[in-house]
Each structure stands twice: as structure tokens, then as C-alpha cells.
Amino acid sequence: MDGNATGRFEEEFSDGSRPGRASNHKLRMVLSGLLVLLVTTSVVVRVVRAPTTLSPLAQTGHDKAPVQTSAPHAVGPASANVVREFGGCELSVSAGAPVVPVGSCTVLEIGDSLGNDLGWGLARELPSGSSLNLVQLDKSATGLANAGYYDWPTELETDLGLYHPQLVLICLGGNDEQGMEVDGSAIQFPSPAWTAAYLTRVRQLITEATASGALVMWVGMPVMEDPDYSQGMEILNSLYQQGVRADPNAAFVSTWQLFSNPEGAYQAVADVNGIPENLREPDGIHYSFTGEDVIATYVIDEIAANFHVQLTPTNPAVITDW
């Protein structure tokens, strides 16, 4: 309500007399103005708040707006062995389940900037105009070690409620080689107390997703150029594997051998589909454009193999030689 409207409203009744027809007309005009003001304010609030609700990922660094795309449309009967009712999504962890068309599924992909790399590759490799819907909600510089900066369990709870995915892809860890605060005390990476606390957070994220009815695929960290940093990633990968083993509706996918040369070491260049390509960025951490396609191709193949569905990358990018 503006100050002029308030003044006019009070002036009509300031002498205590009964308002006449002219006063009633003025009163109706004032009230109409107030109604328009209230409606306008309500609309503005909704327009401003909506993006923060629907787009929780960061606006800077490697992050982009959420990507929603699609993959192969296929129609097929639901397998009798499917563990959960997905309403047309045929992903299944049941041993011996027949391989069927993937159906209509929503895949939520979350993680740090390496997760972003994976998500961008998936957005290109999952065919458009079909019924596998990708929702990419990564945030750079995040992980599970610093919940004070970004609380992934809380964010995931919101995302699960918004998108109701049948599969959650998790790819993070690049920022987690650091100390943590637990119950007000600082604990150092990778002490026994640290690994125990971190494993608890890993399991919390997995359980939160599977309790919502989704399956989980945790994509591990790759070999890194810096040997010490790479060793830290191996420690984290072992914790992701432990977390996944505790839940029958979750799977772990290792990328270590995929991006290691025959000697098991970091190498930035390899032949992809017979052509020499850079797989990694100059920082020795992130994936290049081609590397994004390589990991996306690999993850799509792993989704098909682990969850018994027919799923083929649009333009498969495969390492053919080192």
C-alpha cells in the first residue's frame, strides 16, 4: 500500500460523518487500487522466487543453467523382475532381468565441476526428441566434505521432490581432499575419523535417493595428473564403493582404468575413434570436450549394462589407442 492511498483512505472518515455517494465512489477507487497493488506484488514475488526453486545450481565458474534433454524412445512391456514400479521406466537391478527398451525415465545428474563435465557430455550423447529425460544440477567447488558451503543432502532432497527421477547419477569428490568439521571438531583427511565421517555422508546421499524410489549410479573420480592428488582420489573412490555396496539399488562405476594408459598412469592424449585427441584440460583434472564425450559414452553403456536396458549413445566416443 502506498502512502497516498493510505492518506486518502483516512481522509474520508476523519470527521466521523457517514460517507456520501461521492465518498463511496472514492472509497471504491481506493480499494480497487489496493487490490491491483496486492495482485501485482504477489505476481512479482512468484516471478522472482521461481528460478531459485527450479534452478538450484550455481551461476558462476564451470556451472551452467540446468540441462534437460531426452534419450531413446522405446516402448516395451515391463519386466516381471523389475524391483520398483517406475510407470514406464524399465531400469532394473534384478539379477537376470531381461534387456528391454529403456522406456520413459528421468535421470537426475548431480556433482561438482567434474560432474558438470559428465553432464554436458551426456546432454550431447543422449539422443534428443525421445523419452529419457536428463536433468543436470551440478555445482562447481562443492562436495561432501564442506557441508557449510553447500549441503548436498539438503539440496538433493529438494531436487528429488521437484523432478522425481528414476535414476540419480552422482559424480563428485574432486574438492573433498580436505579437512572436515564434525560435531564442532576439525578432522583431517584421510584420518580414520575423517573416512568414517565421510563414508556416513556418502551413505546418507545414496540412501536419500534410493528411499525416494530412485536407483543410484555413483561415477568415480578419474586418475589425476598430480600423483598426490590422484592418491587422494583413490581413497575417495574406495569410500564410494563401500557406500554403494551397502544398498542393493545402487551401483558404482569406476573411471580410473578408462582414463589411465596401459601402464596405469595419467595421460592426457589418446586416440578416440582412431584420431589423437586431448582427453583432459591443461589443469590435469577436468575433462576436455572430447573427454566429456568419452566418459558420457562409457556411463551410458554402464547404465545399459547395470540396469538391463537398451541404450545407445548418439555419437559414441571410444578410446581406441594410447
Segments from the language model and where they lie:
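Conserved SGNH/GDSL esterase-like catalytic core that processes O-acyl groups on lipids
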Residues: G88, G96-A193, D321
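Active-site segments of SGNH/GDSL-like serine hydrolases
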Residues: C171-E177, E181, L205-N237, W256-Q257
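Catalytic His-Asp segment of secreted/periplasmic serine-dependent ester chemistry enzymes
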Residues: V223-W322
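Charged, glycine-enriched surface loops/patches
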Residues: A186-L215, V219, D247-A250
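N-terminal secretory targeting modules
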Residues: M1-L108, N306-W322
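Solvent-exposed, polar/charged alpha-helical surfaces in well-ordered, non-transmembrane soluble domains
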Residues: N116, W120, R124-P127, T154, ...
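Soluble non-cytosolic domains of exported or imported proteins
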Residues: P101, D112-D117, N146-D151, Q188-T200, ...
